[in-house]
């Protein structure tokens, strides 16, 4: 089955993930972990405010926490109030994390939401805006590719998760 991004989707399967030490070795040594965290600061303190967005310390901390979890192959359970900017925090973390991996190592990031409204907003507002801003500021060259997967076979099962 193909999608608009041109990738072929295979059924989910369990794989053995590299350890944190191995993961750090797989990252691009020129840009790596530290640069990704520096880019979080630049994006949220300079790039977004230049577009009229407010600097939110909680949003920046949340993005750093999520980036740490992604680099460490850990789980981050984060709770944040309405209006903090959670969506941009996790989208920026995911984009920066993917940028640190060589192309063959990049895999899709799965985001599960509680509402159809948020799904639509991510696809129609957040990702197009983020793509445009990150391209204009030299962080990425191509637009962020996203696909919405619907249907009962796509639901996250609490028991199997």
Name each model feature, range by range.
Residues 67-68, 88-104, 127-129:
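Walker A/P-loop NTP-binding motif
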Residues 9-10:
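Low-complexity, intrinsically disordered or signal/transmembrane-proximal segments
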Residues 53-70:
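N-terminal pre-P-loop "Q-motif" helix
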Residues 72-92:
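Walker A/P-loop
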């Amino acid at each position: 089955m193909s999608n608009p991004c041109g990738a072929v989707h295979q059924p989910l399967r369990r794989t053995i993930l590299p350890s944190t030490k191995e993961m750090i070795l797989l990252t691009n040594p020129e840009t790596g972990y530290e640069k990704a965290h520096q880019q979080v600061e630049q994006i949220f303190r300079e790039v977004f405010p230049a577009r009229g967005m407010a600097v939110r310390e909680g949003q920046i901390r949340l993005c750093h926490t999520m980036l740490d979890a992604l680099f460490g192959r850990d789980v981050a359970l984060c709770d944040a109030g309405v209006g903090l900017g959670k969506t941009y925090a996790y989208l920026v973390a995911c984009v920066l994390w993917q940028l640190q991996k060589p192309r063959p190592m990049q895999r899709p990031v799965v985001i599960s939401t509680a509402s159809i409204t948020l799904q639509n907003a991510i696809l129609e507002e957040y990702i197009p805006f983020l793509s445009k801003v990150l391209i204009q500021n030299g962080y990425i060259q191509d637009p962020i590719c996203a696909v919405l997967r619907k249907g009962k076979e796509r639901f996250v099962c609490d028991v199997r998760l």
